[in-house]
């Protein structure tokens, strides 16, 4: 047997045939937990989802808690990767994975369900920009991180690169500046269109300067490249996520802390919990959203394109009403399931066994269906105005044989037809939807939400978009 076949034999058939993961780069101001614990909290949680996300890089950078970034703080990121190096052998049991790919193969394209080696993640941790503000962008500010972003964009890979800014986004700003200096306008445009950035507020400055938006490189990116760089500036989801973490802290104490090596380094409560987590929950391939459409409500919030919190630039955001209340409403709805999902993964980290999420399969014979049935991406169904549409999720299953509970609901904010539609028997495995006669030319977003009956009552979703003709 060839070396490659021997390696592939260690992967389950499901993983070998799975779709590719979403690509993610994290910019973190991780540091001393006595100063700010939430980056460490979010980093632990991120590691428990390494089978769902292709971690292209984790870069240290400035944030509200520091400028410049202290070099000695990199040890806290190393601590997280060291803990992952212990727990990954239990975590990979979740995918029936017996071995790792070669490092060369890991550096290629990873599929959903694959747990990367700790060596791979260590090789992808590096320094980003360690000084804040637009004033430092330019010559002398290149870093391993900004150079690596350019390298990632140049790879032969059609998948977008999501940048989750837990601190400042200035490492991306520096990469953009460098490409602007060295490439043509069309090449710069192509570079920008490879990236999407989700920022947890604007942290390209220390906390005391947080209202001085002109200081930040974020404003430069928003003003200069608004037509080509998809930018989500979150000011509605992370604050509530922090507060809900306080409300649910006892569950963190019982079912996260102390579970596995990752749980043993999960910080003790100081103040708000995991403020940065929504940025990577946003790209979670759980069937609830297509990250390319920020109006779709998911674990990372719900956003509308409009005026930013600097009252000058425009991006996808949720800081103003009514979207602020809308995204908060969805976050309150999803949070218990989000936390249960994390806790279940920490059980795997500790014990190498536990519950797995159900698999949602939705079919319909009522219209022309587009999309992969077993993909986490939404499916589209072309339907006629005034018709009845039958959606059937009875072929959904649970890896552990658990009973499944169904709930179908409409998300009007993502739909171009914003009025309620009639969903008959919304708690059955199959439903009939009456398409209104005045919905011609519109879209209607329906979500099939499925819980199992096992520990933590894990959830999975499927979004169905009815394209009304």
PLM feature segments, named:
Residues 4-18:
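Bacterial Sec-dependent signal peptides at the C-terminal "C-region" and cleavage site
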Residues 422-427:
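Short beta-strand segments within Ig-like beta-sandwich modules, predominantly Fibronectin type-III
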Residues 451-457:
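Short, solvent-exposed loop/turn segments at the edges of extracellular beta-sandwich modules
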Residues 465-469:
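Short beta-strand edge segments in extracellular beta-sheet folds
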Residues 457-464:
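Extracellular and select intracellular beta-sandwich modules with Ser/Thr-enriched
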Residues 14-390, 396-418, 430, 438-441:
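N-terminal acidic, glycine/proline-rich low-complexity segments
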């Amino acid at each position: 047997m060839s070396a490659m076949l021997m390696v592939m034999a260690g992967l389950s058939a499901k993983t070998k045939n799975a779709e590719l993961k979403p690509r993610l780069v994290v910019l973190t101001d991780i540091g001393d937990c006595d100063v700010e614990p939430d980056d460490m909290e979010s980093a632990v949680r991120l590691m428990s989802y390494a089978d769902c996300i292709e971690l292209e890089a984790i870069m240290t950078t400035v944030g509200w808690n520091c400028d410049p970034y202290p070099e000695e703080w990199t040890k806290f990121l190393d601590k997280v990767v060291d803990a992952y190096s212990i727990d990954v052998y239990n975590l990979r049991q979740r995918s029936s994975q017996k071995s790792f790919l070669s490092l060369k193969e890991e550096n290629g394209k990873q599929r959903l369900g694959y747990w990367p080696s700790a060596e791979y993640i260590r090789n992808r941790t590096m320094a980003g920009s360690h000084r804040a503000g637009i004033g430092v962008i330019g010559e002398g500010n290149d870093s391993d991180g900004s150079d690596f972003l350019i390298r990632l964009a140049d790879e032969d890979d059609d998948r977008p690169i999501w940048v989750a800014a837990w601190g400042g986004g200035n490492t991306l700003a520096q990469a953009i500046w460098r490409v602007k200096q060295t490439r043509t306008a069309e090449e710069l445009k192509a570079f920008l269109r490879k990236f999407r950035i989700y920022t947890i507020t604007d942290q390209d400055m220390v906390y005391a300067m947080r209202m001085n938006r002109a200081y930040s490189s974020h404003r430069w990116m928003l003003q200069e490249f608004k037509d080509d760089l998809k930018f989500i500036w979150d000011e509605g989801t992370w604050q509530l996520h922090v507060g809900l973490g306080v409300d649910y802290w006892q569950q963190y104490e019982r079912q996260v802390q102390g579970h596995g090596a990752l749980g043993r380094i999960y910080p003790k409560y100081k103040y708000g919990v995991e403020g940065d987590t929504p940025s990577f929950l946003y790209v979670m391939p759980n069937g609830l959203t297509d990250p390319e459409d920020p109006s779709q409500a998911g674990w990372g919030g719900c956003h509308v394109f409009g005026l930013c919190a600097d009252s000058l630039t425009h991006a996808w955001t949720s800081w103003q009403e009514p979207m602020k209340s809308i995204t908060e409403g969805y976050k309150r709805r999803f949070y218990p399931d989000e936390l249960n999902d994390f806790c279940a993964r920490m059980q795997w980290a500790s014990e190498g066994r536990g519950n797995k999420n159900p698999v949602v399969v939705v079919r319909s014979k009522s219209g022309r269906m587009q999309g992969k049935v077993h993909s986490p991406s939404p499916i589209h169904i072309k339907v006629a105005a005034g018709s009845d549409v039958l959606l059937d999720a009875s072929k959904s299953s649970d890896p552990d044989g658990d009973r499944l509970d169904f709930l179908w609901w409409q998300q009007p904010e993502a739909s171009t037809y914003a009025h309620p539609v009639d969903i008959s028997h919304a708690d059955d495995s199959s439903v009939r939807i009456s398409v209104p006669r005045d919905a011609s030319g519109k879209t209607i977003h329906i979500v099939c939400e499925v819980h199992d009956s096992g520990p933590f009552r894990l959830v999975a979703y499927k979004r169905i978009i009815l394209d009304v003709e």
